[in-house]
Amino acid sequence: MYYDGTGVEQSDEKAVEWYKKAAEQGDAAAQCNLGYMYKNGRGVEQSDEKAVKWVLKAADQGYADAQYHLGYMYSNGFGVEESDEKAVEWYLKAAEQGYVTAQLCLGTMYSQGTGVEESDEKAAEWFQKAAEQGDASAQCALGLMYKYGIGVEQSYEKAAKWVQKAAEQGDADAQYKLGVMYENGRGVEQSYEKAVEWYLKAAEQGLADAQCNLGAMYGNGTGVEQSYEKALEWFQKAAEQGFADAQCDLGYMYDNGTGVEQSYEKALEWYLKAAEQGLADAQYFLGEKYYNGIGVARSYEKAVAWFLKAAKQGFAYAQFRLGFMYDCGRGVEQSDAKAREWYQKAAEQGDELAIEALDWLNDK
C-alpha cells in the first residue's frame, strides 16, 4: 500500500520498512520486493548486492518473480558476476512455473546460443509458451520462426497468425512485419490497403522501417492515393533516424525535384549519409554525381571509388559503370582486362548495356 499509495500517502521509506519486517519473517513476495527497492534505490540507498541477497532468498523459496529477476541480474552482472549460464538456470526455474517473461528470455537465449547450446527447436518451444500467454514479443518472434522455418515447419499462414496477434497488441515491429506480409501476399491475401494500414500504425510509433515503406507506398500510389509530399514526409522521418534506404530515397526525391524543390546539394547530402552506411544504391548514385559533376565538382577518381564500393556488393549498374571507367581510362589506368571483368559481372546479372559493351570489347 505504501509502495503505490493505495489508501495511504505513498512512501518508499515506509514501504521498505514493512517489506523488511515481512522479508525477515521469510515472506517470499516481500523479500523479492525488498530486493527491487534496493536495486532501484527506492526508499533505501541503492545496492545491487543487497538486492541480490533478498531476491535470492525469495528465489530459493521457488518464487517465480524472484527467479526471473535473479536470472536478469546474472545476465547483466548486477550485484553478481555476470553469468549467462546461471541466468539460464534461474530463467528456467521461473519459466517452468509459467512466468512469461522468463519464457521469452529463454527463447531468446536458445535462439542465440547464449549461456546454453543453441537450439532453434527449444527456442520455438519457449516462444510458443510465452506467445500462448499473450506476450507480443514472443508472438512476433514465433511468427518469424514460422515464416523462415526455423525450429518449426515453415508456414506462412502460422507466421501471419502470430504476427497479427502481436500487431493487434500494438507491437510496432509486428505491425511492420504484418504490413510486409500483406504487401507481398505471404500467409494472407495480398492487400496493399491493409499493408498501408499496418505500416501507418508502426510508422506512427516511430519505426523507421515502416516509415520508409509507407513513404514508398505514397510515392508509388500503392494502396493509397499517390502523394509525393506524404512520401517525402515519411522518408524524412526515417532518414532522420539514420535509416539508409530512406536517406537514399530522400536523396532521389531532391535529385529529381519530386514532391520538393530540386536541390542537387541536398540530394548529395542524403546520398552520402546512406552511402557511408554501405548502401549500394546510394554509392552508385554518388558515383554518378561525381562523374557528371552535378552538385559537386567533377572527379572521375571519386566516381570510380564510389562505383567500386557498390560494384563489390554486386550492384549491376555500378559494375557496368566501373567497367566503362576502365574501358575509357577515366579516373583509373585504362585496362581492357579489368573493363572486361566488370562488364562480365554486370552482364551475368542481365545488364543489357554491359552485354553490349562486352560484345564490343571482345570484338576489338
Positions of PLM-derived features:
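Short helix-capping/linker turns of helical repeat alpha-solenoids
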Residues: 2-6, 11, 24-27, 40-42, ...
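Aromatic (phenylalanine/tyrosine) cluster motif
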Residues: 2-3, 19, 36, 63, ...
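Terminal, low-structured helical/coil segments at or just beyond the last alpha-helical repeat
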Residues: 345-364
